[in-house]
């Protein structure tokens, strides 16, 4: 189940972000405490949590007390009060309108947030080159006239990483590369190039941040 959820997550991220994140490896580590999992990005720990393979995690959406027997804990992704309960208490938990999450989903949810927090690091030089190669099949002139005469592949990678760091999707790579070509004629500064790209993606960025009511929430 966990493996299938991770595959689905990678497909979802590819649709949303515009590139395929690296494969996720699952490994046993006997040095970890019991029931502990660790999520790493490039071999460096990014997050950890506790899991009960034979239990269910419940949370009360109202924030109130959860009147079911079990072990109190903290939901690992968002730090919410939670409780591990036996699987045979699922129906009772649902009847009480608690949120019920199985162990694979707990890990996948945590992994999703780790990916979002580290998107820029996950876009490698090789993946950037692949994106440009794929774009070159339909936009050959744009790619050949821009790279490497105006900007290098690593320069494009840095611009894309800047966008991902701001949770801006890079799906519309042709518009992004057009904007890079425009800006790089007058400046080699990657951050200034990114600013120009961001302005060209204004409609996309606004749409992505628009709520169901048609308004963009401001804090």
Model-derived segments and spans:
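Membrane-embedded alpha-helical signal segments
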Residues: 1-219
